[in-house]
C-alpha cells in the first residue's frame, strides 16, 4: 500500500527552519537523484554502498525491507523541466503540481523523449496532477465565491485568468468537463484541494 513520494523541494523557508542549505534548483535535483538511488539500493540489498557528489553511504542497512517488490512505487513531484530526467530514471508516477492541460501535455511529451533516450518504457510511468478545485452550485454561486477570494482591485475575470493554471473552477459540470481535458492528455490520478466551499452540507 505504500507509495513513496519525493521531490527536490522549493520552499526556502522550510530549508532554513530545519537547518538545511537551500541550493539552486540544479543542485537540489542532483541531490534528489542521488537520494532516490540510495533509497532504492537500501530497499533491495542487505547492505548498500554509494558515493556521489552530494551523498555517501557505506554498508547502509534498511530493515525490515518493504513488502512490495522490487520496491514501493516512487512518485516524483515537481514542475521544473530539469526534473524530468530524474522522473524518467526513477519514477513510477510523475505528479505535476498545477498547470493547464496544455502545459502538462508539453511536459509529458518531454518525459516521453527522456524515457526514449534511456530506453525506458514510458508506459511504466503514470501521470498525476495536483489541482485546486473551486466549485459552486451554479454560475452565480461561483462568482460569489470568487468575489471573496480575489484581490481587492481585481475583477472576477482577472482572477479566473490569473488562476487558470492552478484551479479547476465552475459548476460541478464545468469542473468535470475541465478534468476530462487532463484525462485526454494522459493524467490518471488527481490530487485535489477544495477551496472556497460554501458552508452548506449539500456542497460539502
What are these regions, as identified by a protein language model?
Residues 1-204:
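Active-site-adjacent structural elements that line small-molecule/cofactor binding pockets in enzymes
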Amino acid at each position: 500500500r505504500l507509495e513513496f513520494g519525493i521531490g527536490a523541494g522549493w520552499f526556502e523557508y522550510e530549508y532554513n527552519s530545519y537547518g538545511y542549505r537551500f541550493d539552486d534548483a540544479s543542485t537540489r535535483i542532483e541531490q534528489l537523484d542521488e537520494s532516490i538511488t540510495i533509497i532504492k539500493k537500501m530497499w533491495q540489498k542487505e547492505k548498500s554502498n554509494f558515493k556521489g557528489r552530494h551523498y555517501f553511504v557505506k554498508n547502509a542497512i534498511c530493515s525490515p525491507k518493504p513488502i512490495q517488490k522490487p520496491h514501493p512505487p516512487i512518485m516524483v513531484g515537481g514542475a521544473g523541466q530539469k526534473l524530468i530526467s530524474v522522473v524518467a530514471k526513477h519514477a513510477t508516477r510523475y505528479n505535476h503540481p498545477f498547470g493547464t492541460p496544455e502545459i502538462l501535455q508539453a511536459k509529458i511529451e518531454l518525459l516521453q523523449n527522456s524515457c526514449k533516450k534511456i530506453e525506458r518504457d514510458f508506459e511504466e510511468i503514470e501521470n498525476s496532477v495536483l489541482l485546486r478545485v473551486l466549485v459552486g452550485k451554479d454560475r452565480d454561486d461561483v462568482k460569489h465565491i470568487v468575489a471573496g477570494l480575489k484581490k481587492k482591485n481585481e475583477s472576477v475575470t482577472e482572477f479566473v485568468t490569473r488562476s487558470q493554471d492552478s484551479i479547476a473552477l465552475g459548476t460541478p459540470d464545468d469542473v468535470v468537463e475541465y478534468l476530462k481535458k487532463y484525462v485526454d492528455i494522459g493524467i490518471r490520478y488527481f490530487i485535489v484541494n477544495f477551496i472556497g466551499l460554501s458552508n452548506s452540507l449539500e456542497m460539502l
